[in-house]
């Protein structure tokens, strides 16, 4: 199950540069982080759900690519985002 529209709107409002900013790297990485956190709870109950685990690994990889891009372009925004999301990078 994915995030609800309200949850996505909260993330966009918190990390976006404007109200309708859904394309910036910060917003996309935050959305991926929320989806990954949701799926980790799913896997605690459904250990053998390998099909969804593949989707999780794809999301983790895509988030890593976005964060690497952000680190190259704006180191200050990268470090602030990592601290706010609570990621170990």
From Swiss-Prot:
Keyword Aminoacyl-tRNA synthetase: no
Keyword Glycoprotein: no
GO cellular component, one term: cytosolic small ribosomal subunit
Swiss-Prot/TrEMBL keywords: Ribonucleoprotein, Ribosomal protein, RNA-binding, rRNA-binding
Record GO terms (molecular function): rRNA binding; structural constituent of ribosome
Biological process, per Gene Ontology: translation
CDD domains reported for this sequence: Ribosomal_S15p_S13e (cd00353)
SMART domains membership: Ribosomal_S15 (SM01387)
Function: One of the primary rRNA binding proteins, it binds directly to 16S rRNA where it helps nucleate assembly of the platform of the 30S subunit by binding and bridging several RNA helices of the 16S rRNA.
Quaternary structure and interacting proteins, as annotated: Part of the 30S ribosomal subunit. Forms a bridge to the 50S subunit in the 70S ribosome, contacting the 23S rRNA.
HAMAP family for the chain: Ribosomal_uS15_B
Similarity-based family: Belongs to the universal ribosomal protein uS15 family.
Record-linked PANTHER family: RIBOSOMAL PROTEIN S15, BACTERIAL AND ORGANELLAR (PTHR23321), SMALL RIBOSOMAL SUBUNIT PROTEIN US15M (PTHR23321:SF26)
Designated name of the protein: Small ribosomal subunit protein uS15
Organism taxonomic ancestry: Bacteria, Pseudomonadati, Pseudomonadota, Gammaproteobacteria, Alteromonadales
